[in-house]
A protein has these predicted regions:
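Acidic/polar low-complexity interaction segments
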Residues: 1-62, 70-75, 131
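Hydrophobic (often cysteine-bearing) scaffold residues that line and stabilize catalytic clefts
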Residues: 49-53, 118, 149-152
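Transmembrane alpha-helical segments of multi-pass membrane transport proteins and ion-pumping complexes
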Residues: 59, 128, 154-155
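Alpha-helical scaffolds flanking conserved acidic
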Residues: 75-78, 115-118, 147-149
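Catalytic zinc-binding patch centered on the HExxH motif and its immediate surroundings
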Residues: 78-99
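Post-HExxH zinc-binding segment in Zn-dependent metallohydrolases
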Residues: 83-84, 143-157
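Short pre-active-site segment immediately N-terminal to the catalytic Zn-binding motif
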Residues: 102-121, 140
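Catalytic Zn2+-binding segment of zinc metalloproteases
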Residues: 125-140
């Protein structure tokens, strides 16, 4: 499995990707050549978001015994660790990716990054995973498929 401390990803592909997930943007290794950073380092968000999504995809493929074919018809799901200011994260089939954001916590005054949460990143990954298996669910007018999507995201996280 991949994790924030994974070094084999970079050694296999300097663009930080697996066969099914790629990072939208660059991520440079630390001085030791690893992808482990303190939370104060901006690279922490990219490493956390990418590794959480890559782990979810790898675990699902291992469980299913088959490769995921994305509903976007793209080879790889793109992880965009910081898409701007908002308290949000979402999966967008048309863009072929997962988009995470940041904003200021009104109570603490600290910046919060949705991509730093393994639970949020994995939840969004499972929207893409379920969409790969059952793409018709996203176009349903019934409320049940939407609720099922949210449940799968929560279960996966």
């Amino acid at each position: 499995m991949l994790g924030p401390g994974t070094t084999s990803v970079a050694r296999l592909n300097p663009n930080v990707s697996t066969d099914k997930v790629s990072l939208g943007g660059k991520l440079e290794p630390n001085q030791e050549g690893n992808f482990v950073y303190p939370e104060s380092d901006d690279r922490f968000t990219s490493a956390a978001a990418f590794s959480s999504v890559a782990n979810a995809v790898a675990a699902t493929e291992a469980s299913w015994g088959e490769s995921i074919q994305w509903a976007s018809r793209r080879d790889k799901l793109v992880v965009v660790p910081d898409s701007g200011k908002d308290l949000n994260a979402f999966y967008a089939r048309a863009q072929g990716g997962l988009f995470f954001f940041h904003d200021i916590d009104r109570l603490t005054g600290e910046t919060v990054h949705s991509g730093r949460s393994g639970e949020v990143a994995t939840h969004e990954a499972f929207h893409a995973i379920l969409d790969a298996k059952r793409p018709e669910y996203l176009s349903s007018w019934d409320t049940d498929p939407g609720a099922f999507h949210e449940a799968m995201g929560d279960i996966g996280a």
